[in-house]
Regions:
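Surface-exposed, low-hydrophobicity beta-strand/loop segments enriched in small/polar/acidic residues
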Residues: 1-196
Length: 196
């Protein structure tokens, strides 16, 4: 594993598990270290902020989107995830594309969407969104991160234990070495996380 932290993160004591009841994961996938997370101290569960950088949008089929992969990182999207371009305003859930298929082949990671995302281009960030639960449901961010995954986590068939940091402030991360951080997770300066 390459270094992603500039110091030693403070690990939250006690067991946490990935919240597979409220978030989709594919068994065998790896959630990369440095992924922003939302820990629930009461339920002892963790949800993650799923993001990926766009490498290419297929010119002939704009529903096919290639995402960035390297030797240390692969996105952790799952079939059924709702996704939008980072920075998109709240959108009617009926108009939000879902991931219908994921194609992996070596260093290629392609998602096939239920509908194209207008204006999506190379270097944009794709981010998972959720419903706001209202009668006329619209998209919203999953939530504000309050921790970070300390190490890569392989998704298991049943419970998947996760080590997370105590918060997002006690140390710094190399931003280019972690999954893309959505603008909505940053403060007004763009240099710090809101959930500090």
């Amino acid at each position: 594993m390459r270094p992603i932290f500039t110091g030693s993160p403070s690990i939250v004591q006690g067991g946490f598990n990935l919240d597979v009841e409220n978030q989709h994961f594919a068994v065998g996938d790896t959630v990369p270290a440095g992924t922003l997370a939302i820990k629930d101290e009461v339920k002892r569960t963790v949800q993650v902020i799923k993001t990926a950088k766009v490498v290419e949008v297929d010119a002939e089929n704009t529903k096919k989107v290639s995402l960035y992969v390297d030797e240390f990182y692969e996105p952790c999207f799952a079939v059924g995830d709702l996704v939008l371009k980072d920075g998109t305003a709240a959108t009617a859930i009926a108009d939000v594309p879902t991931i219908e298929k994921i194609e992996r082949n070596g260093n290629n990671y392609v998602v096939v969407l239920s509908k194209a995302i207008a204006g999506l281009a190379k270097d944009d960030v794709l981010v998972e969104v959720v419903s706001d639960g209202q009668a006329a449901a619209k998209s919203k961010e999953r939530g504000t991160s309050n921790s970070v995954l300390i190490a890569d986590v392989e998704v298991g068939e049943f419970e998947t234990s996760v080590d997370v940091s105590a918060d997002t402030m006690q140390y710094a991360m190399y931003e280019r070495r972690v999954p893309p951080i959505p603008a909505g997770q940053k403060d007004t300066t763009g240099d710090y996380l809101k959930g500090n």
